[in-house]
Amino acid sequence: MLFRSILIDASTNEIKLMANDMELGIETRVEGEIAERGVIALDAKIFSEIVRKLPDSDVTIETDASFKTVISCEKAKFNIVGKSGDDFSYLPYIEKNDAIVISQFTLKEVIRQTIFSIADNDNNKLMTGELFEINENELKVVSLDGHRISIRNIELKNNYENKKVVVPGKTLQEISKIVPGGVDDDVLIYLTDNHIVFEFDTTTVVSRLIEGEYFRIDQMLSSAYETKVIVNKKELLDCIDRATLLVKEGDKKPIIMNITDESMELKINSFIGSMNEDIDIEKEGKDILIGFNPKFFIDALRVIDEENVSLYMVNPKAPCFIKDDEGKFIYLILPVNFNNAAN
């Protein structure tokens, strides 16, 4: 659970639920009847688990002067201890100007298609977030972890002032969980020097940004290539997925691609066994023998919605690019040494 406490604020004519850890804050308004106004802070994990397992019916929450709380729904009744909301940190006031408008579906998809390649440790804080770069009517979202780069380019409905911010990965993961994802419903995004604000339906999310200048990746995005391969995405994904059956978690065994005219042979060797499989391809340019971390390829292929994908390679020590002709997405994956695994 991300938050320790949830504040239920029924001190006015509406019911608001809030959670805030000083880095990320969420506030949502819910419909209901207020019999007596008040505020209570409840343990976030316990409260959310109770609500999740209650019947799909109206919930009644009652508290007394000592913050003992009764949560009831149909025949179920829970008694838990709350606390005063006096020390609760409300969401900070953010001056909001020039909202960036994007559909809920698009935002959710962009996060899904990039979040897997952020770093999962804090050794480099910038790698734990994603770059949101506004350039007139385009939004570029970038994530990287030192071994791969994911880029999604989105065309916006309007032009905006150019701006770059780094949004924490945990913020985007939470957004992805709570945004309904409707195609016809929008999210309003506000950017300041220190915060990003997401507004959708009856919910507001405020997050601190990660400080620092994001990595300059343009020099890595060369369009030159020696080998281009067009392959059915599902066939390639399924083949690599099968190969990983022979790799224990934690093993660093590469998937080796031997690309020749009209055929890609994929093979893997591990202590468990070996596997090889041929896939039909369209090839342009030179033959190449190259190895990759199979998980990195699987992660990228799983979020691509195209029937066929294009792979661009230069040599066995240079990155592979998976990208479309329209420039909507680019996935860069660094190769690995496979000398010990090729036999």
Model-identified regions with their sequence ranges:
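Structural preference for solvent-exposed beta-strand-turn elements
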Residues: 1-343
